[in-house]
Amino acid sequence: MSTRTARPLGPQLALAGTVGKRVDVLVIGLTSSSDGPEIALGDGIVDEAVLTGLLDTLVAVGASGKAEETTRIPAPDTLPVDSVLAVGLGSAEKLDAEQIRKSAGAAARTLSGVGTAATTLSVLDLGAAAEGFALGAYRFTEFKSAKSAPGPDAQPVARVELLVSSPRAKESKDTLARSAAIAEAVATAREFVNTPPSHLFPAEFADRAKELGTDSGLKVEVLDEKALEKNGYGGILGVGKGSSRLPRLVRLSYSAKKRNAPKVALVGKGITFDTGGISIKPAAGMENMTSDMGGAAAVVATVVLAAKLGLPVDVTATVPMAENMPSSTAQRPGDVLTQYGGTTVEVINTDAEGRLVLADAIVRACEDDPDYLIDTATLTGAQMVALGNRTPGVMGTDAFRDRVAAISQEIGENAWAMPMPAELRSDLDSKIADLANVTNHRWGGMLAAALYLKEFVADGVQWAHIDVAGPAYNSSGPWGYTGRGGTGVPVRTMISVIEDIAAHG
């Protein structure tokens, strides 16, 4: 069992009706227009005359209201704070929850060293503002020693008071509780992804997932290498056989304890480090392959979140964990393995390992007869070629694929529905086994990978595959509520889909 000490993953969030005396900074929103910026009014929480004076000062120092632009000015004597931070919201006509979320995140990133901030962004959208501040303030500093750790002036904001007209109202409290739980789940997934492979290998990942599940009241099952061998999980074992750090399969189950509750299966790729194996990757950028368990991190966080929210849906996460390494014991191009369930596969490329571990897990997940199955993985470089670093690709059964993509776009993770062209399926045929793990060409790699997984999804299951090869990890500068490193995508998509299933079946 992991002995790692938990640390706060974000600021303390609280509701407030007025700007308190202990607040250091007031954060307000600023929209842009052809006539100049305008303050997004705080529903009477801040005196309108005060806001007018603030706007005059902001215009004088060049604030424009451009999305995510931040401008900090001294506070007037009429406000009980030291300074005011205006964050751009962009065009008022185009303002939506995701822009509020991103602007709140941008504000949080600039509040280093602040003890307590209050904000009027919560009047515009309480949930989005709460999520944005919590996620924008997230930092991963676990491996900074005392000599390089951030000083007090670089610490993230410790507390954010979200101003609303009725802070004691049940609706406000429920909204904040949900948003805080979602932000914590996203941060948990980020924490897993950001932890280096020296410290998060399959056994350790399994221990941490088990600890999270146990603490959340979930049913937990962990299969070690002996159990995997006994039960015929050839994909997971094949990928993991080159590493001295042996593979695991973790299952976390949440029961709504409700008769005829919908059943949702989640599957996430958990390659704790991916060298490519014998088909080794180029050295440049390989350090980012610490993120190759981003799908697993997301599904672990999501099933725990479903339990925390008490959703009336049964949710089970099946999580294969392995390290893909080259060695004298590693699988070779040309080897044949047997996936869980009996399908034989010719391994043409050992760097197409994610689909091998996912296939085992999908077959196992389908043995529970779920109504819906969502798998997610940092699966293909082709996803980034087709859609870039911020847009997940969604494939699967048509209706459910479109439903997942629509919900993802609504909540700001912006997944895009993609096809699975039937003509690509024959390119996965093998001359010596049931399937090959890759095609013999480079075209449509993301789509072909989904077609491979489709072979293992049981008939009648509504299925969506979310490829997050780019979106799971931000290797560039921060933006909105997203810092460098793990992003937590697609936790918010998956929990929103599960909530939609709870509401509509």
From Swiss-Prot:
Its EC number is 3.4.11.1, 3.4.11.10. GO terms for cellular component: cytoplasm. The gene is pepA. The keyword Hydrolase applies. The keyword Manganese applies. It is found in: Cytoplasm. This is Probable cytosol aminopeptidase. It catalyses: Release of an N-terminal amino acid, Xaa-|-Yaa-, in which Xaa is preferably Leu, but may be other amino acids including Pro although not Arg or Lys, and Yaa may be Pro. Amino acid amides and methyl esters are also readily hydrolyzed, but rates on arylamides are exceedingly low; Release of an N-terminal amino acid, preferentially leucine, but not glutamic or aspartic acids. Mn(2+) 1 binds at D274, D351, E353. GO terms for biological process: proteolysis. It comes from Rhodococcus opacus (strain B4). One of its GO terms (molecular function) is metalloaminopeptidase activity. Its main location: cytoplasm. Keywords: Aminopeptidase, Cytoplasm, Hydrolase, Manganese, Metal-binding, Protease.
